[in-house]
Amino acid sequence: MKAYLKSAEGFFVLNKSTTIGRHENSDLVLQSPDIDNHHALIEYNEAECSFVLQDFNSRNGTFVNECHIQNVAVKLIPGDILRFGSAGLTYELVIENPPPVSFPWMRGPAPWPGPQPPRATQQPNQAPPPSHIPFHQGVQPAPMQRSWSQAFPRPTVVLPASHRRPVSANKEMFSFVVDDARKPPVIKQVWTNAMKLSEKSVAEGIPGAVPPAEIYVEEDLAQQDKDEIILLLGKEVSRLSDYEIESKYKDVIIANLQNEVAELSQKVSETTTSRQNEKEISQKCQVLDEDIDAKQKEIQSLKSQISALQKGYSKVLCQTLSERNSEITSLKNEGENLKRDNAITSGMVSSLQKDILAKDEQVQQLKEEVSHLKSQNKDKDHQLEALGSRCSVLKEELKQEDAHRELREAQEKELKLCKTQIQDMEKEMKKLRAELRKSCTEQSVISRTLREKSKVEEKLQEDSRRKLLQLQEMGNRESVIKINLERAVGQLEHFRSQVIKATYGRAKPFRDKPVTDQQLIEKITQVTEDNINFQQKKWTLQKETQLSNSKQEETTENIEKLRTSLDSCQACMKISCCSHDLKKEVDLLQHLQVSPPVSGLQKVVLDVLRHALSWLEEVEQLLRDLGILPSSPNKDQVQQFSGNSAVFTAGKAAGASGREGEAERGEARARGEAQSQNQATDGREGGKALEEYITQERNRAKETLEEERKRMQELESLLAQQKKALAKSITQEKNRVKEALEEEQTRVQELEERLARQKEVLESSIAHEKRKAKEALESEKRKVQDLENHLTQQKEISESNIAYEKRKAKEAMEKEKKKVQDLENRLTKQKEELELKEQKEDVLNNKLSDALAMVEETQKTKATESLKAESLALKLNETLAELETTKTKMIMVEERLILQQKMVKALQDEQESQRHGFEEEIMEYKEQIKQHAQTIVSLEEKLQKVTQHHKKIEGEIATLKDNDPAPKEERPQDPLVAPMTESSAKDMAYEHLIDDLLAAQKEILSQQEVIMKLRKDLTEAHSRMSDLRGELNEKQKMELEQNVVLVQQQSKELSVLKEKMAQMSSLVEKKDRELKALEEALRASQEKHRLQLNTEKEQKPRKKTQTCDTSVQIEPVHTEAFSSSQEQQSFSDLGVRCKGSRHEEVIQRQKKALSELRARIKELEKARSPDHKDHQNESFLDLKNLRMENNVQKILLDAKPDLPTLSRIEILAPQNGLCNARFGSAMEKSGKMDVAEALELSEKLYLDMSKTLGSLMNIKNMSGHVSMKYLSRQEREKVNQLRQRDLDLVFDKITQLKNQLGRKEELLRGYEKDVEQLRRSKVSIEMYQSQVAKLEDDIYKEAEEKALLKEALERMEHQLCQEKRINRAIRQQKVGTRKASLKMDQEREMLRKETSSKSSQSLLHSKPSGKY
């Protein structure tokens, strides 16, 4: 069954087990920072015919169908969407010919059903337990975790995008369920944790889960209220997630403690096995003691026999007996020492057993404490459940504020108690860990002491074995060598003569003196040593040359590769600074395969190039943001600078042409005005004066224009200087950065060279010391081999008998090795061998009697031979002395090796310290480079800002120059003062603009920092809001849509009302037109009256006043119009007609009224809320009416105080009556009713919102819950202040919650950092453990080699001792020929001793077999 992973890049074929990660050896390599080296594994389960995904506890985890998974195994189905890490490609699982397997989770209910009974929430919890999933070797699943696909039923229908869990939800699912009944909607809050549900909790109805809380929400709630409810629910989720994190931490601690308990139990089992071994050792020691007692008895009997025989023996026999007595006493002393050692070891064993019992008790106590801690954790889990139930009760009783507060206080107290308990528990856990560590260290110390004691016992046993073997071989060889001595002496002489001929040649070395054996041996040793040394030197030199040549070739190849790659990088950096090319070069350099001494330099160069590449990418991004394409950097820079200069020159040319055009326009205007004045004043006398005045003004204007041009040139020069200074500073800083980078690169290279030199020196010194040690060992081995060869040559003289004995000894050794395997078979074989040995002793006794007879006959002929034997004994003594010297040399060599190891360790420590120092320096250099890059980027940003400000200044100057030819005043009274004031005003304006620019630059710099901080806060708020929005249900979205529909309906109603208002305004305009027609009729009638009254000269002033009164009295009707243009016309008419007293004051008041009206209109336009539009319209109309009435009254009062008031009152009364009749009935009824309804709705909404906010946020002092409908102005101001105070309280509460969230996020970051440090420490610990294991293996091998060398030396000593004893036996035979019968009896006793010694030896051989 083939399976593929489908992605945007193609298809990837899955094997039975495919590894995924960043490591090169993984099957699917994903090069992204979110993925670990060994991220996950997809394995095929043949039992269930499905694929299983296993996450290796990665940092960012994996996502299966947008569900976060970490350290969990998940069964996959065709069509599952996988994503490794938080950001990366998505893969779809495609299986060819999938098996017809019915997935049980496909039968479950759909995840988003309609209205269901309350038991529907428990259905997912009753899902069957997950099937057994085979995990990868070395990876065990977490104990309290389940897979996403098994813990929750999968729907057959594809889920909508809104149901998927957001990325920021942190392993938790959060959902709202809204009942669709006629009751008010209930928001049910449900927390489920897909990664923590255990099978027990599923079977028992999830006792650890918190019951869902319900919040009753009215149907008329606004969207803001719902958002605030969602925020509060999210905060409660975060609060409960803290408890879940703490419980996780406790579970991890419990698992660690369980592992430690398991390790301790294993150690206890090992101690029990060691006890059994110690019991066996004690039994064997008892058997040895019994054998030693029997031997002592035999020795005493032998002493008594020897004392009886000593009377008739000669001096030679006395000497031999005394020597044997001394040997026996030494054996006794050794036996006593063995007994003492046995007693000491038994005491030590008993003390160790006591210590082990005490530690077992400590382990039991720790187990009890662990169980107690588990029970406490269970109690705390129950307490958490109780807390969850209390939270649900609190949510149900939101309306009852008093009970809610009391419960919250109780919860806070319990939380504090829980926190204190948790802290105490953590302290106790730390103490327990410390005690466990102490116990582990003590056990390790005890185990070491036991090992050392066992080694000492083994050495003692080996010594005793060797001595017993020596005794046996002495007895056997004494009987055999007596017979074959004659042949050996002849062969020795012949062999000696041949050796002399071979060494010295045919010529005699010393004609007068004979060649001694010592001279001959020295000559042979010299020749052999010279030959061996020559061969060894040749061999070592060949090896060294080969190794050095291979290493040099490898290093040269690696250095050449690195040089070529570095040359290409340097060429890329010199030719073009494109990030794409540099990235290619860095990738090529990274994929170079280099040996370890050059790899460190490669890493450092890669770090430097990556930093330069990141800086280059940031620069290119900035250039792209500015609109410059960074394809070819050199050309683009040139084009950019040329474009900037072209833009600057074009701006200059445009400014100059604008100025010339403005000057020409001014001249044209002046000419037109002059012509018009000349035409108007043809018949007047002041024509010449006006022309002179115009010429003066032209000259002044030209002077002002020239001065402005000069100032502009100065400003442009200053700008150019500033740009040059900035460019210079930027270039200097870039050069500094480059120099710093080069210096850092040189330093890094120097450091790498130093490291390489130190490594080479260390390696050479270590190799030299190893060679010296090997040469010393080999020379000593050669000496030993020479001695062995010499001895074998001497042994070959004693021909077939010695070979026969050796064969027998080998057979006996093989038999003893076989006896070690099975103790019972050995005992039987030893009995058979004892019987055989008794028979052999009889035969040997007969042979000895015959040999003694033969020796008596050949005593006289072999006197010379005895002298030769003595010389041989002397030589043997000398060889023994040489062996002792070799032993001392071996000890010295061992000491040297130990010292060398210590030196190597010290050098390694120094290397590590130097490495740490170099790494720290490199990190400091990297930080400095980052800081330089940041300063460069900030300076470039400042440059951009300065250029933008300069552009703004130029634009403002151009606008000011456009506005320079200001229109001249119409008044001809002060023509000379106006141009001076204008020029001074322009100068002041320029100065103010420059000051404003400087201040604006400072403010912009300060505001940019604030803007960056606000952007960060906005991004955080957006992320949180997106998380909360992602957790909304479909029903809440439906409610939001309904609210949107309501808002649209309200907007439509407002548009309808606006249309009605437009109709009303059209009606008002019609009425205004009618009023204008009436006014025109009145004016016509007034003109008629004037024509009639002109005839009467006496009544002119009265008629004038009447016309003024009528005009003034008609004006208020005109002022009640809505448009500002009509108002201005009425006031201008008044000003024209009332050109008498206080004309200027009236104009100023009109201007003030107009400015106030415009300001109010702007303020009303800024307010955009639809709820207050009607209110604004009404207030606007009221203000207009009041202002117009006040203005008209002031004009009437101030225009002419002498006018009669009766006429005003008579005309005003009918006008007011008309206005009230026309506007009161239509506007007041429609406008005031709408405004009142809108105000009531807004107050209701505000009161509901404030109540819900106060209840949700536990704000006690919400005192603004009072309607402002029937309150006076003072009371309204008080209520407004209270509401402002409530808003401040809400704002403070929200800021507190934000701060709490920030602190929690910081804690989480700290925890993540600690986890990463633990992972790194684990990796380093594993490395150190592997190194320690390697060192232990090396030490063990060296110890074995030393033991083999020691055994060879001991064999040589044993053989020499045997030859000494043979020579002594020969002497005894020569002296004691007369007393043969007594000697035969003595030999029989010796044979009996040998049989007893063999039996003891077999027992000693059986002891190590028990151990092994």
Curated annotation (Swiss-Prot):
A cellular-component GO term for this protein: sperm flagellum
Subcellular location: Cell projection, Cilium, Flagellum
Disordered: annotated span: 106-133, 652-688, 955-976, 1086-1110, 1372-1412
UniProtKB keywords: Cell projection, Cilium, Coiled coil, Flagellum
Entry keyword annotation includes Zinc: no
Tissue expression as described in the entry: Testis (at protein level).
Major subcellular location class: other
Domain FHA, first and last residues per copy: 18-69
Keyword Coiled coil carried by entry: yes
PANTHER family: FORKHEAD-ASSOCIATED DOMAIN-CONTAINING PROTEIN 1, FORKHEAD-ASSOCIATED DOMAIN-CONTAINING PROTEIN 1-RELATED
Biased composition (Low complexity): 1397-1412
Start-end of Basic and acidic residues biased regions: 659-672, 955-973, 1086-1099, 1382-1396
Domain of life: Eukaryota
UniProt name for this protein: Forkhead-associated domain-containing protein 1
Coiled coil: 250-466, 692-963, 999-1099, 1141-1169, 1292-1360
Function summary: Regulator of sperm motility and spermatocyte meiosis.
Organism: Homo sapiens
InterPro entries xrefs: CC-FHA_domain (IPR052642), FHA_dom (IPR000253), SMAD_FHA_dom_sf (IPR008984)
